[in-house]
């Protein structure tokens, strides 16, 4: 399976993402510069964390207009897996692949620590190797990770089982309904603020994030068999 790691000016988690896929997961991964216009040959797209375009205007607002974005939209429309982490999640909301928005943390401080997450939906291509209700430990590092949506959108997310991860015990940023990660209605686009790529090795704190990537590979292989 081959993963595309999209790089923007200001990305700083792209190397972490590449390392997670190549070295921990054992799959192919390549960088794709934001000015490219093709994702041919790739099976999954990863939008990493960082500060694309310096977070000017607002997080993800300028990345929305990058040349690669029409191809990311087409990729998602084809049903292929798209994962946006931290700034990548913010970008996914800006381009309309996911509802809602990410705003300033309610304490107005940058947060960098490992937090407990509850797996709210284990029936997605990203969470198939987790158990529903399982508590996992994944790092966060953000200043604008406070997920916001209106009441109608929140109800829809709940009704469609689109809330995939929630913060457990303590909500670090004020996100509505403790939301840490959501999928689109089709289930092939996941946005999350915590960093699974930073939880893929025991030596740096655990491997709870690795199963997310393993789940994607498992779902992809099953699709190839059934194709």
Swiss-Prot record:
It catalyses: N(2)-formyl-N(1)-(5-phospho-beta-D-ribosyl)glycinamide + L-glutamine + ATP + H2O = 2-formamido-N(1)-(5-O-phospho-beta-D-ribosyl)acetamidine + L-glutamate + ADP + phosphate + H(+); L-glutamine + H2O = L-glutamate + NH4(+). Part of the phosphoribosylformylglycinamidine synthase complex involved in the purines biosynthetic pathway. Catalyzes the ATP-dependent conversion of formylglycinamide ribonucleotide (FGAR) and glutamine to yield formylglycinamidine ribonucleotide (FGAM) and glutamate. The FGAM synthase complex is composed of three subunits. PurQ produces an ammonia molecule by converting glutamine to glutamate. PurL transfers the ammonia molecule to FGAR to form FGAM in an ATP-dependent manner. The active site is at 86 (nucleophile), 195, 197. GO terms for biological process: 'de novo' IMP biosynthetic process. Pfam families: GATase_5. The keyword Ligase applies. Gene3D superfamilies: 3.40.50.880. It is found in: Cytoplasm. GO terms for cellular component: cytoplasm. Keywords: ATP-binding, Cytoplasm, Glutamine amidotransferase, Hydrolase, Ligase, Nucleotide-binding, Purine biosynthesis. Part of the FGAM synthase complex composed of 1 PurL, 1 PurQ and 2 PurS subunits. Residues 2-226 form the Glutamine amidotransferase type-1 domain. It comes from Listeria innocua serovar 6a (strain ATCC BAA-680 / CLIP 11262). SUPFAM superfamilies: Class I glutamine amidotransferase-like (SSF52317). Its EC number is 6.3.5.3, 3.5.1.2. This is Phosphoribosylformylglycinamidine synthase subunit PurQ. Pathway: Purine metabolism; IMP biosynthesis via de novo pathway; 5-amino-1-(5-phospho-D-ribosyl)imidazole from N(2)-formyl-N(1)-(5-phospho-D-ribosyl)glycinamide: step 1/2. HAMAP family: PurQ. GO terms for molecular function: ATP binding; glutaminase activity; phosphoribosylformylglycinamidine synthase activity. NCBIfam families: FGAM_synth_I (TIGR01737), PRK03619.1 (NF002957).
